[in-house]
């Protein structure tokens, strides 16, 4: 009897253990539905705000250009008006940033990276209106900036806003929704959902806590953001360059050469960005009046430049198809490239609210097309198409500068719908990234974040020192 009882108890214990193991196994992949629901909300909001931001910037640009068209026959009015309109619009952006939310200046992507590490604040109630309205001013003025930086920062801040509205206190939820909003923001800017996901995994890999919950939330947010974008803007690729021919195997070595060129250009470009930032900091010294006037002057010059050489101003999306089609000579391509390098440095490094992705894509297109046209002359037996080198170069500068080759490859392929060029793009972007790393170049966003944190620590140390001095007196 005792033996039967012992056997029965042993069997019950085994059953309970198995049941507990099955329960734990089932719960291991049980993503909290609340986080997925909030990720869907964040993605939807980011898509709506991203589309609204794009439409608002286009409206400001059209209003400015429309005003200039009215006086196009009167040169004595046209040139001053072009300067004044762009200067005033730019000054709005600079003033709002400096006065209400300094963290909204520049791209905003380093701020999201810092927030993921709990090193930078997320004041969404300030950043959202400042980044939106300020970006309308600077991008509407025709400055050489992109809208992807604002939408990424706006998306991340929307993620924190949703978290606060639903009163979630979990550190995991806070981190996950911030990353979800950032990924949805990139997707909303470029209609590139896969690039948005890869951007979080690759570019923000030191900060992103990869687990089943976070990655499912990012997927959910990006899906919703992309759906919203396509409802309003359609499903066509954001950059229309047409279907280009494949790259024959015997020409792939040329793409490696192109990657080597960008591997040299990337670190130099990053160094110029940082040095220009230091130059502007020395000029205005943190004084809001000097900073706003400086921004107005840069904006006004971009307005004038838009009259002289329209291709040298603006984010660059309109320039990319024209350049990739081979409508410029090699000399003119290089001239526009140098001009846009200068304008990109002035606009981005001055702290204007706006991104640098779009300007870098345009720069890569210009240099890639110039290389392709030169190679076509040097190697006529290959029957090369310059547009394929334009596509490869478009992602190569981003890969070398930001050190995110996968994101650069997928982003360009999604934006242009030329997936058949994936092999030459891999060769170009990988070559650019490896050489940039070998030359000692540092990722641009990580370097900017490190400088921001160093400045933050210095300011905090100065405050503590002043407080101690006050107590001693």
Swiss-Prot record:
Gene3D superfamilies: Clc chloride channel
UniProt cross-references to InterPro entries, sorted A to Z: Cl-channel_ClcA, Cl-channel_core, ClC
Site (Mediates proton transfer from the protein to the inner aqueous phase): 203
Selectivity filter part_3 (motif): residue ranges: 355-359
Keyword field contains Cell inner membrane: yes
Classification via HAMAP family: CLC_ClcA
Function: Proton-coupled chloride transporter. Functions as antiport system and exchanges two chloride ions for 1 proton. Probably acts as an electrical shunt for an outwardly-directed proton pump that is linked to amino acid decarboxylation, as part of the extreme acid resistance (XAR) response.
Protein name: H(+)/Cl(-) exchange transporter ClcA
């Amino acid at each position: 009897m005792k033996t039967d009882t012992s056997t029965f108890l042993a069997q019950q214990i085994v059953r309970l253990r198995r049941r507990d193991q099955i329960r734990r196994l089932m719960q291991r992949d049980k993503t909290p539905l609340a986080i997925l629901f909030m990720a869907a909300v964040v993605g939807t909001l980011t898509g709506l705000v991203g589309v609204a931001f794009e439409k608002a910037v286009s409206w400001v640009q059209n209003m400015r250009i429309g005003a200039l068209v009215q006086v196009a026959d009167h040169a004595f009015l046209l040139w001053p008006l072009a300067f004044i309109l762009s200067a005033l619009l730019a000054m709005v952006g600079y003033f709002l940033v400096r006065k209400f939310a300094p963290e909204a200046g520049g791209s905003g992507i380093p701020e999201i990276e810092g927030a993921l590490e709990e090193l930078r604040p997320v004041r969404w109630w300030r950043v959202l209106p400042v980044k939106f309205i300020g970006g309308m001013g600077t991008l509407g003025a025709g400055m050489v900036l992109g809208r992807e930086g604002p939408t990424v920062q706006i998306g991340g801040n929307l993620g924190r806003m949703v978290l606060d509205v639903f009163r979630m206190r979990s550190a995991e939820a806070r981190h996950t929704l911030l990353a979800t909003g950032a990924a949805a923001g990139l997707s909303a800017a470029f209609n590139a959902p896969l690039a948005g996901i890869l951007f979080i995994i690759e570019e923000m890999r030191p900060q992103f806590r990869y687990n089943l919950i976070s990655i499912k939330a990012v997927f959910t947010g990006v899906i919703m953001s992309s759906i919203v974008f396509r409802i309003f803007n359609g499903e066509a690729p954001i950059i229309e360059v047409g279907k280009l021919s494949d790259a024959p195997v015997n020409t792939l070595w040329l793409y490696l050469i192109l990657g080597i060129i960008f591997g040299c250009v990337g670190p130099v470009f990053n160094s110029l960005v940082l040095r220009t930032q230091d130059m502007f900091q020395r000029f205005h010294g943190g004084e809001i009046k000097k900073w706003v006037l400086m921004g107005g002057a840069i904006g006004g010059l971009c307005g004038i430049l838009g009259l002289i050489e329209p291709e040298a101003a603006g984010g660059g999306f309109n320039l990319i198809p024209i350049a990739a089609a081979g409508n410029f000579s090699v000399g003119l391509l290089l001239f526009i490239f140098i001009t846009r390098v200068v304008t990109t440095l002035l606009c981005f490094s001055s702290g204007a609210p706006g991104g640098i992705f779009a300007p870098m894509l345009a720069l890569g297109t210009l240099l890639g097309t110039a290389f392709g046209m030169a190679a076509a002359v040097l190697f006529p037996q290959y029957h090369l198409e310059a547009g394929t080198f334009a596509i490869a170069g478009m992602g190569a500068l981003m890969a070398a500068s930001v050190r995110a080759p996968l994101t650069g490859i997928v982003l360009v392929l999604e934006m242009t719908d030329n997936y058949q060029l994936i092999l030459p793009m891999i060769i170009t972007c990988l070559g650019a990234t490896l050489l940039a790393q070998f030359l000692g170049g540092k990722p641009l966003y990580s370097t900017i974040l490190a400088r921001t944190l160093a400045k933050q620590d210095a300011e905090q140390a100065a405050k503590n020192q002043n407080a101690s001095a006050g107590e001693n007196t």
